[in-house]
C-alpha cells in the first residue's frame, strides 16, 4: 500500500510495547492503517490525540524516532469474480503467485448484513459426513469454525466439507496453518477440479500471528459479496 506524498509523517513515539506503539496525532480514526518504520500497523485505540497502533510484524527494533505515516483508510479487499480459485494472505494479497485481483474495493470489518433482514437459515448443505449431517447440520449462510489440536486431521475434514458441500462458493479462512497445510488444501482442490469455487484467506505459521485477526473479516467480506451481490449459495 503506497504512501501518498501529502501525508504527514510523525517521528516521535510516546511508548513502545511488544506489539504496539503510541504517539500523538490529530484526526486519526479507529481501524485506520499506518506504516511504522516500514511495517504495516493498524489503529486499535484513540484517546484524545493519543493513538495506539498494533504493529502486525511486531515492534522489535523500532526506535522512538521511527517514521509513522497514516494511510487514511482501514483494511480493504477488492471483490469480483476474479477472487474465485485464488489463495490470499491476511491483507488480501495473492499467496498463489497469481496476479492482483481487480474489482470493487470494500472495507473489511465494516457493518455486515443486518441479520433481522435475512431469512432464517433453513436450507441444509449436505456434506456427506454423517457426524456433521446428523449431529451438527450445516445450513446456507452459516459461518463454521473448525477448532482442532495440531495432531488432529482437521485439514482433511475441512477439505471434505468443502468438496462435498452443494454450494456455489466456499470461503475458507485459515489461521496459523503450516505451509504443508496450505499446500495440502491447494493440491486437494486442484485435484478435485473444484478450485474455481474456492476462495481462501490464509495466515501460515511463518507469518506474524497478529495478522490472523484480519482473516475472519477478509473471509466474511468475500462471503457477503458472493451471497448478497451475486446471489450465490455460499459456505
PLM feature segments, named:
Residues 2-8, 12, 16-17, 22-127:
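Acidic-enriched and Gly/Ser
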Residues 130-157, 163-235:
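Switch/coupling sub-region of P-loop NTPases
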Amino acid at each position: 500500500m503506497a504512501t501518498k506524498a501529502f501525508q504527514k509523517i510523525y517521528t516521535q513515539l510516546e511508548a513502545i510495547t511488544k506489539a504496539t506503539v503510541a504517539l500523538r496525532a490529530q484526526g486519526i480514526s479507529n481501524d485506520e492503517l499506518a506504516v511504522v518504520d516500514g511495517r504495516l500497523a493498524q489503529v486499535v485505540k484513540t484517546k484524545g490525540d493519543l493513538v495506539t497502533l498494533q504493529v502486525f510484524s511486531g515492534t522489535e527494533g523500532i526506535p522512538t524516532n521511527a517514521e509513522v505515516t497514516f494511510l487514511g483508510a482501514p483494511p480493504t479487499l477488492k471483490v469480483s469474480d476474479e477472487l474465485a480459485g485464488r489463495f490470499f494472505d491476511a491483507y488480501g494479497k495473492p499467496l498463489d503467485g497469481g496476479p492482483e485481483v481487480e474489482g470493487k474495493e470494500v472495507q473489511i470489518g465494516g457493518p455486515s448484513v443486518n441479520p433481522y433482514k435475512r431469512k432464517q437459515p433453513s436450507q441444509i448443505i449436505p456434506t456427506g459426513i454423517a457426524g456433521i449431517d446428523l449431529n451438527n447440520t450445516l445450513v446456507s449462510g452459516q459461518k463454521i469454525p473448525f477448532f482442532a489440536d495440531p495432531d488432529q486431521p482437521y485439514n482433511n475434514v475441512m477439505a471434505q466439507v468443502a468438496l462435498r458441500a452443494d454450494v456455489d462458493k466456499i470461503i475458507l479462512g485459515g489461521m496459523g496453518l503450516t505451509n504443508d497445510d496450505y499446500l495440502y488444501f491447494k493440491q486437494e482442490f486442484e485435484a478435485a477440479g473444484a478450485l474455481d469455487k474456492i476462495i481462501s484467506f490464509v495466515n501460515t505459521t511463518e507469518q506474524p500471528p497478529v495478522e490472523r485477526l484480519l482473516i475472519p473479516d477478509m473471509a466474511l467480506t468475500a462471503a457477503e459479496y458472493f451471497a448478497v451481490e451475486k446471489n450465490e449459495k455460499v459456505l
